[in-house]
Each structure stands twice: as C-alpha cells, then as structure tokens.
C-alpha cells in the first residue's frame, strides 16, 4: 500500500511539473554519448536524460528549443525522433517534483534495501540515502546502459522484465547480447518463467 501510494504521488508531482512548463523529449540515434552531450551544450535548455543503450540517448528540452536541436542532430549525422510525451522528464525541469517527492519519501520512513538494488541515477547499488536517491532520479539522467553493464559485471546473466512490452529486454540485448532476457506481462507469465529460468 505504501509503495503504491508513493508511485501515485511521484506521478502527480511529475505531472504538475510538466504542466508548469512547455517541454518535450526526443530520442537521439546513431550518435555517441559525447556527441549528444556536446550538442546539448550548445543549447540553454536541452539536456541528455536517458542513456538507454549504445547509440540511443533521450533528451529533454524546452519546447521552443527542440526544433533547432533536431536540426543540429541531423546535421551531425544522427537521427532524432520526437517522443509522444508531455514533459521534459529526468531533467532540471522536474526539480520541483523531486523536492516534493523527497518530502513524501521522508514521511514514509523507508529502509535501505536488504539485497543489492541498482539505482539508475548512479548505476550503483543503493546506499543509506534511499530518499535522496529515489527523489533525485526524477530530475537527474537515467544511466540505464551503465546500470546494466554494472549488474553484468557483478555477475548478472539473466534479466526479467515485468510489465507491458519488451522495451527493456531490447535495450539490454543491444547493450550486451551475451545475457539472457525474459519478459512477463501477466502474473501467469511470471510464474511460468520462474519455472523455466535458472537463477543467475
């Protein structure tokens, strides 16, 4: 119940922040992280926010700056795909949402994880500051590729994606094709997988 309530509060805060400013997101393909970071630096309010897998980075931007950024990506030899979202997530545009969510988390009195849980903000296991890390993920970049590589380096060889779709399985496969990925959209799918998958 506490977890579900926090998920709802997080969504509310992010929605409020998204409505406060006209922002947008786009996926940048075929460019290196350094190239995308350099392009973003040429704009006052364009930020690299999701480092998904090799050759795929998402940016958040002030809506009025996005057209020029898309043109810059094309000129640099990359490809940019505008995303159908209403908000510049995982960026400074979400700073107020992060602050508000931190208060909710503090009130919930969370404990540190009993097993290693990797934070996408740092690509490292959570430490003692669970509140700061969870809140900070709202307005900081998602280091998904680095997180996957860190888990593989720590010994993970099998990844399970729970929920609709196989997006994360695809990103993991593009990051390291040697690991196994499985997706379970329904409870019965998960139960079947647990019978078939050998633990890492």
Regions inferred by a protein language model and the residue ranges of each:
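Alpha/beta catalytic cores of group-transfer enzymes, especially the acyltransferase/condensing modules
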Residues: 1-141, 177
């Amino acid at each position: 119940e506490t977890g579900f309530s926090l998920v709802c509060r997080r969504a509310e805060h992010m929605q409020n922040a998204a409505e406060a400013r006209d922002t947008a997101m786009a996926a940048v393909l075929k460019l290196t992280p350094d190239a995308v970071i350099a392009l973003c630096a040429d704009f006052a309010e364009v930020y690299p926010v999701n480092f998904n897998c090799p050759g795929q980075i998402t940016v958040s931007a002030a809506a009025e700056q996005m057209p020029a950024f898309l043109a810059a990506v094309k000129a640099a030899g990359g490809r940019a795909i505008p995303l159908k979202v209403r908000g510049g997530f995982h960026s400074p545009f979400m700073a107020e949402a992060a602050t508000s969510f931190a208060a909710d988390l503090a009130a919930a009195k969370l404990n540190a994880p009993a097993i290693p849980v990797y934070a996408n903000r740092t690509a490292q296991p959570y430490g003692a500051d669970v509140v700061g890390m969870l809140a900070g993920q709202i307005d900081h970049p998602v280091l998904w590729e680095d997180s996957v590589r860190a888990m593989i380096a720590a010994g993970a060889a099998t990844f399970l994606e729970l929920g609709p779709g196989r997006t994360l399985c695809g990103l993991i496969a593009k990051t390291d094709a040697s690991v196994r990925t499985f997706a379970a959209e329904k409870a019965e799918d998960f139960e079947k997988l647990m019978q078939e998958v050998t633990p890492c």
